[in-house]
Amino acid sequence: MAEAATGFLEQLKSCIVWSWTYLWTVWFFIVLFLVYILRVPLKINDNLSTVSMFLNTLTPKFYVALTGTSSLISGLILIFEWWYFRKYGTSFIEQVSVSHLRPLLGGVDNNSSNNSNSSNGDSDSNRQSVSECKVWRNPLNLFRGAEYNRYTWVTGREPLTYYDMNLSAQDHQTFFTCDSDHLRPADAIMQKAWRERNPQARISAAHEALEINEIRSRVEVPLIASSTIWEIKLLPKCATAYILLAEEEATTIAEAEKLFKQALKAGDGCYRRSQQLQHHGSQYEAQHRRDTNVLVYIKRRLAMCARRLGRTREAVKMMRDLMKEFPLLSMFNIHENLLEALLELQAYADVQAVLAKYDDISLPKSATICYTAALLKARAVSDKFSPEAASRRGLSTAEMNAVEAIHRAVEFNPHVPKYLLEMKSLILPPEHILKRGDSEAIAYAFFHLAHWKRVEGALNLLHCTWEGTFRMIPYPLEKGHLFYPYPICTETADRELLPSFHEVSVYPKKELPFFILFTAGLCSFTAMLALLTHQFPELMGVFAKAMIDIFCSAEFRDWNCKSIFMCVEDELEIPPAPQSQHFQN
């Protein structure tokens, strides 16, 4: 009984919605009927006579002023439309029409099943959009003191934005602090230091934390034991203070490496001690988690220092050991550091082995994964690839695999080829990246451009094939080929992550809507006619009369008919009629 009542209500609702869709026609005829019935009481004929008399008394200057005013208003609307489009990437009038007017005109499907399916689809797409627009820590980020600050000293430009540095501060507070830091004075100072905006204040706080730790070791340790080894075990150095000094105060990679080695000694002792106490309560477990993050961060940065200083094999060994020791800590994306170091060693077999593990459908992708896979496929055929030969004989199986790998990589991040082909200038990569965005493309190309140049013909193959990707995905924001549709939010996030002097790459290219172009042309043409009519009324009257005579002439109609007939004949390819034998010579 309840199901029957529910079905009846749904049918009644659909009938009401259908009637509202066409009810405006009924209202229109009702209004016409009422006007006809009430024409005598309302004195419609007299009012029309008064209006016609008023219009007849108007001078041409009034029409010119009216036209100019309408053109001015249209121009203001055009300027607002252009500003709204530049800022938000869509037309304001189109957005209002789609969002507000279409539901009022009955453009919304009220079927319950369709609504449930669409709501589920929308929620899935929203979740995908959130995951796609998540900001990630750049696994190949540079050192602030030894690299970013040196760039600022030379060029006077700030390579990092406030938003990017604020995200780094949040990461440091997440990785390097815990709830029990207030129990240790040095850690309490560092907890405040990570929140400081001023770099000099952070560095001073790190030195203060080390000094407090040193004073406590001198005062308290002799009361407990006289052994130097026991002193180090009791009161270790503050590892996070050394991390901050290595990141921001050290002006060279060698200095940063020395500080990280001191941080490693302190961090390793804290890690071993908290590992034994982690099962004694939630507080000790959180402290052990913090010490694990600190130790992994230090070892990863030491491996990156070795890579910067040319000790690539040592860096590879350190990264492999780190991945074996902490296989579950994927937040640092150490495998991307390993791939870059292996490419520097030209150990392509090892690169393929790493890709086989991480280039999986269930794991999140990155530009490093996709473009490294494309580089390995291109390496097999790029030295012999020729566009002319490929157009004559077609692509071989290996060449087809390489082209498909390039198309896959370009679909994931379409900004990378412009940097690899040096069509756009590179800048220092940010500390955070947006996957599939311009920031990720800069971070990848900054370190991997040399690897592509080292493979003979790889850039030539990329240059010949990368634009073919866009033919497979004509509407990338709506539907993808191998990946989800391209996220809309990348441009806004990249503008926050990248410095203002860099021109952010936008995909897909935004074109001005036809409405804006049509409005601009119409406003300009109307304003020009109004100005000419006001300045030269007699000449414009003669011109208008001449144009009317031309369009109404018989010659113009005959010419128009002939043009239409010729177009139809060309379209249908009508063969010419055969000549009669009586007219042949």
From Swiss-Prot:
<feature type="transmembrane region" description="Helical">
    <location>
        <begin position="15"/>
        <end position="35"/>
    </location>
</feature>
<protein>
    <recommendedName>
        <fullName>Suppressor of tumorigenicity 7 protein</fullName>
    </recommendedName>
</protein>
<keyword id="KW-0325">Glycoprotein</keyword>
<keyword id="KW-0597">Phosphoprotein</keyword>
<feature type="glycosylation site" description="N-linked (GlcNAc...) asparagine">
    <location>
        <position position="47"/>
    </location>
</feature>
<comment type="similarity">
    <text>Belongs to the ST7 family.</text>
</comment>
<keyword id="KW-0812">Transmembrane</keyword>
<keyword id="KW-1133">Transmembrane helix</keyword>
<dbReference type="Pfam" id="PF04184">
    <property type="entry name" value="ST7"/>
</dbReference>
<dbReference type="InterPro" id="IPR007311">
    <property type="entry name" value="ST7"/>
</dbReference>
<feature type="modified residue" description="Phosphoserine">
    <location>
        <position position="386"/>
    </location>
</feature>
<feature type="transmembrane region" description="Helical">
    <location>
        <begin position="512"/>
        <end position="532"/>
    </location>
</feature>
<keyword id="KW-0472">Membrane</keyword>
<feature type="transmembrane region" description="Helical">
    <location>
        <begin position="62"/>
        <end position="82"/>
    </location>
</feature>
<dbReference type="GO" id="GO:0016020">
    <property type="term" value="C:membrane"/>
</dbReference>
